[in-house]
Design a protein with these regions (language model features):
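Hydrophobic faces of well-ordered beta-strands that scaffold small-molecule active sites
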Residues: 4-10, 34-38, 114-118, 179-181, ...
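The substrate-binding groove and active-site-proximal loops of carbohydrate-active enzymes
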Residues: 6-16, 75-97, 145-161, 282-295, ...
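Short, acidic/polar
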Residues: 14-29, 159-170, 323-336, 387-399
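Surface-exposed amphipathic alpha-helices with a cationic face
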Residues: 28, 100-115, 299-313, 363-375, ...
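Aromatic-lined carbohydrate-binding/catalytic grooves of carbohydrate-active enzymes
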Residues: 33-94, 422
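Substrate-binding cleft of secreted/luminal carbohydrate-active enzymes
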Residues: 39-43, 338, 343-355, 377-434
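Polysaccharide-binding and catalytic clefts of secreted carbohydrate-active enzymes
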Residues: 119-121, 132-337, 346-347
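Active-site clefts of carbohydrate-active enzymes
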Residues: 264-284, 317, 364-393
Length: 435
C-alpha cells in the first residue's frame, strides 16, 4: 500500500519545552514522519488531554493553554472588514516568537512537509461572550447555545469574515503546504437519553433517535440565520415551529412538557428511523439542510481565499464528530471545497473494543462523500491507553481502507514505543510513503 504522508501535530509549548530538532528526530526516526504541522490557534483544553501527565516533557507535567490564542504572526490588515481581531499568546515563555516559522524552518531543512491547524475555536470565546454576544449561536428559544467551548455563528458577517481572513493570512504569510481545521461549526446539542427504566432491555445512553432529538438544543436561530434561510427559500417559520416541537419532545419529563412525555418515551424506546421524523417534521430536515448549505458556503469562501493566497495549498478538514451532518458538514457538499480530509478516530486509545469497525465505517463514509481525487488521512492514537500491538493492528486495518496518509494523535502525549509501533506496523503491512 502506498501513502503520501505520515503527519504529526505539535504545539508551541512542545517546541519551547523540547526543542524542534529533538521532536523532529523522534518523529522521523521512530515513526517515519515526513510532515509536521503546528496547532497554530489552540482552543481552551488541558494538555495532554487523555492522561494526567506528559510522557516525555522534562519541563512540565501538564499544560493549560490560553483560550484560542495565535502562536504565529498575522497581518492585522487582513481583518479590517471584521470587528473580530485575532488574540495572541500572553505567556512570557511563548511571546515574541513565531512558532510556525520555527517549525517550518526545521521541517524544510529535513525535506518535510509543513502545515498549520486552526483548531476548534479560533477566537477567544470568553471575549466573544462578554463583548460580542450578538455573534454567539442562538437556540430555538433565543438563548445562547450551551456549549463548553462556545460557538460563534458562521452566518454572522463578522464571524464569517474573521474565519475566512484567518485562513487566508495563515497561508499568505507562512511557508506551509497544508492548512487544516477542526473548526466547530453548528452546535449539535447533546444526545437525549432514554428513560432510566428502559435500562433492563436497552442501552439508555445511546437510543437510536437520541442524537437527532438533541439537535433541538443546537443552533443557530439568530437573525442572520433567519435572513439567510429566507433568502435561500427555506420556510423559516416551519423550521422554528417544528424545532420547538422537537425541543419539547426532547425535554419532556414527568414534570416538564408533559404533553410530549409519551412521545418522548416511545420515540426513544422504539426502532423508529430518522426518516419518519423528517416526514412528520419537515422543518427538521430543512434545518439540517440549511446548516449544511451555510457551512458549505463558508468552506467555499475559505477555499477560494487560501488558493488565491497560495494556489498549491492543501485545505484539509479535520473531522472530529460522530455525526458531521448534524453539525453542518456534508462530505459530498464540501468535496469541491477541500483538498483532503483527516478523520480523527482514536479507537486505539480506547482498546478498540469494536475491532476498528467504527474507524473503517467512518473512513468509508468520508471516501463516499469526497470521492477518489481528494486525499483521505486517517488518525492513529499514539497516546497512553493505546498499545504497540493495537497500533500495529490498526495499521493492518488501515492498509485495507484506501487511505492516502496517516496522522498521529498526538505527539505531546505519545509513548516512544507507540511511535516505534508506527514504523514497525508500516513495515509489517508494506505501507510505503511515495511522493
Amino acid at each position: 500500500m502506498f501513502i503520501k504522508e505520515v503527519a504529526s501535530s505539535l504545539y508551541a509549548w512542545d517546541l519551547a519545552d523540547e526543542g524542534i530538532a529533538t521532536i523532529a528526530d523522534n518523529l522521523q526516526e521512530r515513526a517515519n514522519c515526513n510532515c509536521m504541522y503546528l496547532v497554530g490557534v489552540m482552543h481552551y483544553e488541558k494538555r495532554p488531554l487523555t492522561s494526567l501527565y506528559y510522557t516525555h516533557n522534562t519541563k512540565r507535567k501538564f499544560y493549560l493553554p490560553e483560550n484560542s490564542r495565535a502562536y504565529y504572526r498575522l497581518n492585522m490588515d487582513s481583518f479590517k472588514n471584521t470587528k473580530l481581531k485575532s488574540c495572541f499568546t500572553e505567556r512570557d515563555f511563548l511571546k515574541g516568537v513565531d512558532w510556525l516559522d520555527v517549525l517550518t524552518e526545521e521541517a524544510r531543512k529535513r525535506g518535510m512537509k509543513t502545515g498549520v491547524e486552526l483548531s476548534h475555536t479560533i477566537f477567544d470565546t470568553n471575549i466573544a461572550r462578554e463583548q460580542y454576544p450578538e455573534m454567539m449561536q442562538r437556540d430555538v428559544n433565543g438563548g445562547i447555545v450551551k456549549d463548553l467551548q462556545g460557538l460563534l455563528c458562521p452566518n454572522h458577517p463578522d464571524v464569517h469574515e474573521f474565519q475566512r481572513a484567518m485562513f487566508y493570512d495563515s497561508v499568505k504569510n507562512h511557508d506551509v503546504d497544508i492548512v487544516q481545521t477542526c473548526l466547530l461549526t453548528f452546535g449539535a446539542g447533546q444526545p437525549v437519553k432514554a428513560p432510566w427504566f428502559f435500562a433492563p432491555w436497552m442501552d439508555i445512553e445511546n437510543p437510536s433517535m437520541g442524537a437527532i432529538l438533541g439537535l433541538a438544543d443546537g443552533g443557530c436561530f439568530c437573525e442572520h440565520c433567519r435572513a439567510k434561510a429566507i433568502k435561500w427559500g427555506y420556510d423559516w417559520e416551519r423550521i422554528v415551529h417544528d424545532m420547538k416541537t422537537i425541543h419539547a419532545i426532547a425535554h419532556a419529563t414527568p414534570y416538564a412538557f408533559q404533553d410530549y412525555l409519551m412521545e418522548n418515551n416511545l420515540t426513544l424506546g422504539s426502532n423508529l428511523t430518522d426518516c419518519m421524523l423528517y416526514i412528520e417534521y419537515p422543518g427538521l430536515l430543512d434545518f439540517i439542510k440549511f446548516r449544511i448549505q451555510s457551512i458549505t458556503e463558508l468552506f467555499a469562501d475559505i477555499y477560494k481565499s487560501v488558493h488565491e493566497a497560495k494556489p498549491g495549498i492543501d485545505f484539509r478538514y479535520n473531522n472530529h464528530v460522530r455525526y458531521p451532518e448534524y453539525t453542518g458538514i456534508s462530505f459530498k457538499d464540501i468535496a469541491p471545497y477541500v483538498d483532503s480530509v483527516r478523520e480523527s478516530d482514536y479507537s486505539e486509545q480506547r482498546g478498540a473494543p469494536d475491532k476498528f469497525v467504527f474507524k473503517r465505517n467512518t473512513l468509508h463514509k468520508i471516501r463516499r462523500g469526497i470521492g477518489f481525487d481528494k486525499d483521505l488521512i486517517s488518525a492513529l492514537a499514539v497516546r497512553p491507553n493505546a498499545t504497540p500491538e493495537l497500533i500495529r493492528e490498526s495499521l493492518g486495518v488501515l492498509a485495507q481502507c484506501g487511505i492516502d496518509g496517516l496522522s498521529l494523535g498526538h505527539y505531546d502525549g505519545a509513548h516512544m514505543e507507540h511511535l516505534d509501533a508506527i514504523k514497525q506496523g508500516m513495515s509489517e503491512y508494506n505501507i510505503t510513503i511515495v511522493k
